[in-house]
UniProtKB/Swiss-Prot annotation:
<keyword id="KW-1003">Cell membrane</keyword>
<keyword id="KW-0796">Tight junction</keyword>
<dbReference type="GO" id="GO:0038187">
    <property type="term" value="F:pattern recognition receptor activity"/>
</dbReference>
<keyword id="KW-0007">Acetylation</keyword>
<feature type="modified residue" description="(Microbial infection) Deamidated asparagine; by herpes simplex virus 1/HHV-1 UL37">
    <location>
        <position position="549"/>
    </location>
</feature>
<dbReference type="GO" id="GO:0009597">
    <property type="term" value="P:detection of virus"/>
</dbReference>
<feature type="domain" description="Helicase C-terminal">
    <location>
        <begin position="610"/>
        <end position="776"/>
    </location>
</feature>
<feature type="modified residue" description="Phosphoserine">
    <location>
        <position position="8"/>
    </location>
</feature>
<feature type="modified residue" description="Phosphoserine; by CK2">
    <location>
        <position position="854"/>
    </location>
</feature>
<feature type="modified residue" description="(Microbial infection) Deamidated asparagine; by herpes simplex virus 1/HHV-1 UL37">
    <location>
        <position position="495"/>
    </location>
</feature>
<feature type="region of interest" description="Mediates interaction with RNF135">
    <location>
        <begin position="735"/>
        <end position="925"/>
    </location>
</feature>
<dbReference type="GO" id="GO:0010467">
    <property type="term" value="P:gene expression"/>
</dbReference>
<dbReference type="InterPro" id="IPR001650">
    <property type="entry name" value="Helicase_C-like"/>
</dbReference>
<dbReference type="GO" id="GO:0045944">
    <property type="term" value="P:positive regulation of transcription by RNA polymerase II"/>
</dbReference>
<dbReference type="GO" id="GO:0016887">
    <property type="term" value="F:ATP hydrolysis activity"/>
</dbReference>
<dbReference type="GO" id="GO:0045087">
    <property type="term" value="P:innate immune response"/>
</dbReference>
<comment type="subunit">
    <text>Monomer; maintained as a monomer in an autoinhibited state. Upon binding of viral RNAs and conformational shift, homooligomerizes and forms filaments on these molecules. Interacts (via tandem CARD domain) with MAVS/IPS1 promoting its filamentation. Interacts with DHX58/LGP2, IKBKE, TBK1 and STING1. Interacts (via CARD domain) with TRIM25 (via SPRY domain). Interacts (double-stranded RNA-bound oligomeric form) with RNF135 (homodimer); involved in RNA length-dependent activation of the RIG-I signaling pathway. Interacts with CYLD.</text>
</comment>
Length: 925
C-alpha cells in the first residue's frame, strides 16, 4: 500500500466509521488480524456500538505492515456486500455516500414515526439489496424475539449505515407497495433540502405550520382564510396572497420607483414586502425589456433561506431565480449566471469581488438592488463597498442607468448619538449611503400591525454574584504562578502590552494575552535559538493563561463544574500533544490543585445565584404556560455548552428539551456549527416537539428564520440598540416576555440606554418624514459629495510588490519554514510552497473534516515539525493531480532577510510580495 493510499484512508475515515460495521467483515480479514484484535473489535461493538468498533478496526488496519492487506480490505468489503463503500475507496470518491447524508438526517428526524408505523417483516425482502445479509437476519431475529418496534429500530440503525445510493428510493417503493402511511412522510424525489418542514409537520399532525417564505409568522398573510394555519393546504401555500394593508403601506414608496429604506419591526413580514416590490418591479417593464433584481443577504444561513423563498414564490411567474454565495462562487461563472437569470440572491462580497475583477462591468446590469439588514451599510462592510461603486457612478456623471435601491431593516440604529439631532445626522448618513430618499414605516395602519407584531414585556433582573468564590481564588493563584514563570523567561513581559491593571476573568485580560502573543511573535534577539526558546515558552504560558481566564468567565456565568470540565479537557489535549517540559510543569501544577477544585465545584454552597434565578424564571413561565417556547441568548459558545449541560443535569428542569444554535466559527478551527446542523436545529425548534428551548449566541440575532417563541431571556447579553430590537423581536407570540438577567448593574444600565436610543431613533425618523422631499434629497447629496471627497483623498496608490526574498518563520517557535521565493499562488487566493526542503518542515495529520471544494480536495492538516511545537500551518490538498501543502499567512512571521525586521500579517492580501502564479511544469523539476 502506498503512503498516499494510507493517508487517503485516514482522511476519509469519518465516512468509513459512519458506514462500516467491522464485525461483518472480520472473517474475511483473518489473514491480517490477530485473534485478540478480532475479540477487541467485537467487544467494542457490543459495549459501545458499530461506530466505535469501526474506529478501533481502522486503528488496527492502519498499523498493519504486511504486503497486500489494503487489497484484502477492499476484497473483504466486496465479499460482505459493502459495494458502495468498496467503490468509494477504490476511486477515493465519497460523493455518492456524502449525498446520502441528507436522507440520514431526514430518517433520524422521522425515527419516532418510523418505529411506530413500520412492520419490518413486511418490507425486509424488498430492502434486502440495500442491507448486508447479516443485517437482514438480525432484523428478523429481533422482530421474532423482541417485537416489531424493536425490529424497526434495528432497521433504522442499518439504513442509517447503508452505503447503497438507492436505499432512499428503494425504501419509498417498498412502503408504497405495502400502502404504508409512512410513505407520505418519506419524500425522496428532491431530498430533505427541498422538502418543506411544514409539509412534514402537517402530515405528522402538528399544528405549528410556517409558510414557506416566512421570515416571521406574519408572513403567512392568512387573515383572509377562515381555516386555522394547520388546515391550510399545499395549494394555498404557494398561491398568491392578499397583502395586509400595512405591508402595502411599506411597499408603496418603492413601488413608485423611489430608493427606500423599509424600517419595520421583526415579525411584520418584510420578506413578503420585498417579494411584492420585486414582482411589481419585474412586471412594469414593457414588451422587449427586462428587469434584473439582485437581493443581498449578509449571512449564509439567511442567503440559503431567501434563495428558497424567492425561488418558490417566483417559479409560478416563470422568472428565473438563482443564488451565488462564497461557498459556491469558485465553481460557477458569475457573469454568465447574472446574465441568464432574472433574480439573483447574493452574499455581498461576491459582487464586490466581481466588480473589482471586472467580470461584472458595472451596477447598471441590475435594475433593482435589495439589501437585507441594510443597517450594516457603513464603514468597510461589503454593502458599503457596493454602494461606494454606485455613488461613484452617480456622482461621476456616468451615462449608465443606476438600479433602484431598497433597504430592509428592523432598526436603522443611531450609532453613538446622544441626542435627537445627532441621531438625525446618523440616520441621514445611512440614507446617503443607500441613496435613499424615503424611510418607509407603518403610520396609517398601526392598529393592524399591532395585531400581528406583539411587543414583549421587558423585565430586568439584577442578581447578586457568589458571596465567596474559592474556585476563582485557586485559579487566580495558578494564573499568578504562571505569570511569574513567564516573567522569569522574559523580564520585559509587562512592557509587551500597553494594557495595564488587567483583572483575571475579564475580556480585558483576554486582550492583554492577545497583545502579548503578537508582541512575542516579532520579538527578536541576536541568539536565534534563544529567541525561539523564549517565544515558544511565552506562547505556551499565555495559552494556558487564556484557558484559565476562559474558565473563570464560564464559572462566573455557569457552574464551577462546567469551568473545571473545560480545563480538564484542555489539559487532556495538552497531554495528548507534544507535552514538553513547560507543559509538564504547568499540568503538574494544575493537577496538584485538581482535588481541591473538584471538592469546591461539588459543594452545593457554591451554586451560582444567576443559575438559581434562571431556574426560577423557567419554572415559573413553564408552570404558567407548559407550551412555552424559549430562546436563551448568551455571549459565547462555551457558555452555550455549559448551560445546555446544566439544564440537562437539573432535575427541576426535566420538562425542558434544549437545543443549541451557534455561529459557524473560523474556518481554521473545529468550532461552531455547520450550515446543515444549524438548519437541522432550526427545523427541530420549529417543530415544537424536539426542542422547547434554544440556547443561542448572536447568530440568532439577525435574519435567520426562527419560529415563534413567547419567552426571550438575555443572559448577561446586551449589545447596541439594533441588537436589542432584533433579540427582543424573537419573542413573536402574543403575551411574550423578555428577561434581561445579570449580576452587573452596568448591563441593565446599557440596556436602558438602548431603550432610550430606540425612542430617539423613532422620534428622529418621524422628524425626517416631515421634511420636504427636495430638502431631504439635497441633504443626502451634500453628505454623499462630502463622503466621496474624503474617500478620494484617502485613496492610496496600489502598493508595488516587494521583490526581495523574505523568510517565513513559524509564529510559535520561530523555526524557518520557507522563503517567499518558493511560494506560488493558485487561483489568486491559495498559497503553496515548492521544493522538498519545505516538506521536511511540517508533519501531516488526517483532516477532521475532509472535503472537496473547487479544484481542491482537502485531505490533511499540516503542523510545524519542530519538536514540541506542532503549530497549525494550514492544510494538505490534492489539486488536480498534485499533492501539495496550502499555507495560511496568519501562522507565520515574515522576516526581512536584509534588515531582520519581523512583521505579522493576518491576510495574504496585506502582504505585498511578488506573487508568482503556480505552474504545473515546476512540479516536475
Amino acid at each position: 500500500m502506498t503512503t498516499e493510499q494510507r493517508r487517503s484512508l485516514q482522511a476519509f475515515q469519518d465516512y468509513i466509521r459512519k458506514t462500516l460495521d467491522p464485525t461483518y467483515i472480520l472473517s474475511y480479514m483473518a489473514p491480517w488480524f490477530r485473534e485478540e484484535e478480532v475479540q477487541y473489535i467485537q467487544a467494542e461493538k457490543n459495549n459501545k456500538g458499530p461506530m466505535e468498533a469501526a474506529t478501533l478496526f481502522l486503528k488496527f488496519l492502519l498499523e498493519l505492515q504486511e504486503e497486500g492487506w489494503f487489497r484484502g480490505f477492499l476484497d473483504a468489503l466486496d465479499h460482505a456486500g459493502y459495494s458502495g463503500l468498496y467503490e468509494a475507496i477504490e476511486s477515493w470518491d465519497f460523493k455518492k455516500i456524502e449525498k446520502l447524508e441528507e436522507y440520514r438526517l431526514l430518517l433520524k428526524r422521522l425515527q419516532p414515526e418510523f418505529k411506530t408505523r413500520i412492520i419490518p417483516t413486511d418490507i425486509i425482502s424488498d430492502l434486502s439489496e440495500c442491507l448486508i445479509n447479516q443485517e437482514c437476519e438480525e432484523i428478523l431475529q429481533i422482530c421474532s424475539t423482541k417485537g416489531m418496534m424493536a425490529g424497526a429500530e434495528k432497521l433504522v440503525e442499518c439504513l442509517l449505515r447503508s452505503d447503497k445510493e438507492n436505499w432512499p428510493k428503494t425504501l419509498k417503493l417498498a412502503l408504497e407497495k405495502e400502502r404504508n402511511k409512512f410513505s407520505e412522510l418519506w419524500i425522496v424525489e428532491k431530498g430533505i433540502k427541498d422538502v418543506e418542514t411544514e409539509d412534514l409537520e402537517d402530515k405528522m399532525e402538528t399544528s405549528d405550520i410556517q409558510i414557506f417564505y416566512q421570515e416571521d409568522p406574519e408572513c403567512q398573510n392568512l387573515s383572509e382564510n377562515s381555516c386555522p394555519p394547520s388546515e391550510v393546504s399545499d395549494t394555498n401555500l404557494y398561491s398568491p396572497f392578499k397583502p395586509r394593508n400595512y405591508q402595502l403601506e411599506l411597499a408603496l414608496p418603492a413601488m413608485k420607483g423611489k430608493n427606500t429604506i423599509i424600517c419595520a419591526p421583526t415579525g411584520c413580514g418584510k420578506t413578503f414586502v420585498s417579494l411584492l416590490i420585486c414582482e411589481h418591479h419585474l412586471k412594469k417593464f414593457p414588451q422587449g425589456q427586462k428587469g434584473k433584481v439582485v437581493f443581498f443577504a449578509n449571512q449564509i444561513p439567511v442567503y440559503e433561506q431567501q434563495k428558497s423563498v424567492f425561488s418558490k414564490y417566483f417559479e409560478r411567474h416563470g422568472y428565473r431565480v438563482t443564488g451565488i454565495s462564497g461557498a459556491t462562487a469558485e465553481n460557477v461563472p458569475v457573469e454568465q449566471i447574472v446574465e441568464n437569470n432574472d433574480i439573483i440572491i447574493l452574499t455581498p462580497q461576491i459582487l464586490v469581488n466581481n466588480l473589482k475583477k471586472g467580470t461584472i462591468p458595472s451596477l447598471s446590469i441590475f435594475t433593482l438592488m435589495i439589501f437585507d439588514e441594510c443597517h450594516n451599510t457603513s464603514k468597510q462592510h461589503p454593502y458599503n463597498m457596493i454602494m461606494f461603486n454606485y455613488l461613484d457612478q452617480k456622482l461621476g456623471g456616468s451615462s449608465g442607468p443606476l438600479p433602484q435601491v431598497i433597504g430592509l431593516t428592523a432598526s436603522v440604529g443611531v450609532g453613538d448619538a446622544k441626542n435627537t439631532d445627532e441621531a438625525l445626522d446618523y440616520i441621514c448618513k445611512l440614507c446617503a449611503s443607500l441613496d435613499a430618499s424615503v424611510i418607509a414605516t407603518v403610520k396609517h395602519n398601526l392598529e393592524e400591525l399591532e395585531q400581528v407584531v406583539y411587543k414583549p414585556q421587558k423585565f430586568f433582573r439584577k442578581v447578586e454574584s457568589r458571596i465567596s468564590d474559592k474556585f476563582k481564588y485557586i485559579i487566580a493563584q495558578l494564573m499568578r504562578d504562571t505569570e511569574s514563570l513567564a516573567k522569569r523567561i522574559c523580564k520585559d513581559l509587562e512592557n509587551l502590552s500597553q494594557i495595564q491593571n488587567r483583572e483575571f476573568g475579564t475580556q480585558k485580560y483576554e486582550q492583554w494575552i492577545v497583545t502579548v502573543q503578537k508582541a512575542c511573535m516579532v520579538f527578536q534577539m541576536p541568539d536565534k535559538d534563544e529567541e525561539s526558546r523564549i517565544c515558544k515558552a511565552l506562547f505556551l504560558y499565555t495559552s494556558h493563561l487564556r484557558k484559565y481566564n476562559d474558565a473563570l468567565i464560564i464559572s462566573e456565568h455557569a457552574r464551577m463544574k462546567d469551568a473545571l470540565d473545560y480545563l480538564k479537557d484542555f489539559f487532556s489535549n495538552v497531554r495528548a500533544a507534544g507535552f514538553d517540559e513547560i507543559e509538564q510543569d504547568l499540568t503538574q501544577r494544575f493537577e496538584e490543585k485538581l482535588q481541591e477544585l473538584e471538592s469546591v465545584s461539588r459543594d452545593p454552597s457554591n451554586e451560582n445565584p444567576k443559575l438559581e434565578d434562571l431556574c426560577f424564571i423557567l419554572q415559573e413561565e413553564y408552570h404558567l404556560n407548559p407550551e412555552t417556547i424559549t430562546i436563551l441568548f448568551v455571549k459565547t459558545r462555551a457558555l452555550v455548552d455549559a448551560l445546555k449541560n446544566w439544564i440537562e443535569g437539573n432535575p427541576k428542569l426535566s420538562f425542558l428539551k434544549p437545543g443549541i444554535l451557534t455561529g459557524r466559527g473560523k474556518t481554521n478551527q473545529n468550532t461552531g456549527m455547520t450550515l446543515p446542523a444549524q438548519k437541522c436545529i432550526l427545523d427541530a425548534f420549529k417543530a415544537s416537539g424536539d426542542h422547547n428551548i434554544l440556547i443561542a449566541t448572536s447568530v440568532a440575532d439577525e435574519g435567520i428564520d426562527i419560529a415563534q417563541c413567547n419567552l426571550v431571556i438575555l443572559y448577561e447579553y446586551v449589545g447596541n440598540v439594533i441588537k436589542m430590537i432584533q433579540t427582543r423581536g424573537r419573542g413573536r407570540a402574543r403575551g411574550s416576555k423578555c428577561f434581561l438577567l445579570t449580576s452587573n448593574a452596568g448591563v441593565i444600565e446599557k440596556e436602558q440606554i438602548n431603550m432610550y436610543k430606540e425612542k430617539m431613533m423613532n422620534d428622529s425618523i418621524l422628524r425626517l418624514q416631515t421634511w420636504d422631499e427636495a430638502v431631504f434629497r439635497e441633504k443626502i447629496l451634500h453628505i454623499q459629495t462630502h463622503e466621496k471627497f474624503i474617500r478620494d483623498s484617502q485613496e492610496k496608490p496600489k502598493p508595488v510588490p516587494d521583490k526581495e526574498n523574505k523568510k517565513l518563520l513559524c509564529r510559535k517557535c520561530k523555526a524557518l519554514a520557507c522563503y517567499t521565493a518558493d511560494v506560488r499562488v493558485i487561483e489568486e487566493c491559495h498559497y503553496t510552497v515548492l521544493g522538498d526542503a519545505f516538506k521536511e518542515c511540517f508533519v501531516s495529520r488526517p483532516h477532521p473534516k475532509p472535503k472537496q471544494f473547487s479544484s481542491f480536495e482537502k485531505r490533511a492538516k499540516i503542523f510545524c515539525a519542530r519538536q514540541n511545537c506542532s503549530h497549525d500551518w494550514g492544510i494538505h490538498v490534492k489539486y488536480k493531480t498534485f499533492e501539495i501543502p496550502v499555507i495560511k499567512i496568519e501562522s507565520f512571521v515574515v522576516e526581512d532577510i536584509a534588515t531582520g525586521v519581523q512583521t505579522l500579517y493576518s491576510k495574504w492580501k496585506d502582504f505585498h510580495f511578488e506573487k508568482i502564479p503556480f505552474d504545473p511544469a515546476e512540479m516536475s523539476k
